[in-house]
């Protein structure tokens, strides 16, 4: 559902209880429910028109002298991400939905579900340590699947699987902050660049807020 400002707002009013039951089945008896509000802003870093041929294949033309063009180096990413602060947002959305959270052995897993246009269910799992606030793994399953690792100041590879083709991606996280506290909720902040090899790159600034909602 989209509001008058073009901001996407979830969640379907019907079927909420059945989805909660499904999340409970996934997480087990220790699941606790939170109301999760996800806000995301996306900025375009570059598109295909900025690519040049090189010995490494298609790669973005270097914007910093002396930096090799085998891919976007971290120096280039920092420069491009800083420049987007002056650019208009290319995509913005907000979700509000139920998320189940289970905690054990110093690890936390948050799971939420979304319905797609065909009526199917897409699941997103967020895995993190309750001690290490600078590392988060997000697993998406359903019509499209991927495993994404966000580690502050580090670059990680990911593959985005779709029914049509797979996309090779690189993720570079400039900011990973996590204030989640069991029983009290909290917020997860991500600021990262996502490069789709041979296509484009975007910067995403995302906040996930968890508020306890026990039933």
Ranges and model annotations:
Residues 30-35, 70-76, 104-111, 134-137, ...:
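Short, hydrophobic/aromatic-rich segments at coil-to-beta transitions
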Residues 42-49, 115-125, 144-149, 168, ...:
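Short, surface-exposed beta-strand/loop "edge" segments at domain boundaries and coil↔beta transitions
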Residues 98-101, 125-128, 175, 190-194, ...:
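Hydrophobic/aromatic beta-strand elements that line small-molecule binding cavities or substrate pockets
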Residues 141-189:
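Acidic, glycine-rich flexible loop segments
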Residues 182-215:
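Mixed-charge, glycine-accented linear interaction segment located at domain edges/termini
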């Amino acid at each position: 559902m989209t509001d008058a400002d073009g901001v996407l707002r979830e969640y379907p009013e019907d079927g909420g209880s059945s989805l909660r039951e499904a999340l409970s089945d996934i997480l087990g008896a220790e699941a606790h429910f939170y109301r999760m509000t996800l806000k995301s802003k996306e900025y375009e870093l570059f598109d295909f028109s900025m690519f040049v041929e090189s010995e490494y294949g298609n790669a973005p033309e270097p914007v910093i002298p002396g930096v090799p063009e085998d891919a976007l180096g971290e120096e280039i990413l920092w420069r491009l991400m800083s420049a987007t602060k002056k650019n208009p947002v290319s995509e913005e959305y907000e979700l509000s939905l139920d998320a189940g959270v289970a905690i054990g052995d110093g690890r936390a897993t948050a799971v939420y579900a979304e319905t797609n246009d065909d009526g199917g269910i897409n699941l997103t799992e967020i895995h993190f340590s309750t001690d290490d606030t600078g590392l988060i793994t997000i697993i998406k399953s359903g019509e499209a699947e991927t495993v994404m690792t966000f580690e502050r100041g580090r670059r990680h590879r990911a593959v985005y699987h779709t029914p049509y083709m797979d996309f090779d991606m690189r993720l570079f996280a400039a900011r990973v902050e996590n204030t989640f506290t069991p029983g009290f909720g909290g917020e997860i902040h991500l600021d990262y660049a996502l490069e789709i090899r041979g296509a484009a790159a975007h910067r995403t600034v995302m906040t996930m807020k968890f508020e306890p909602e026990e039933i």
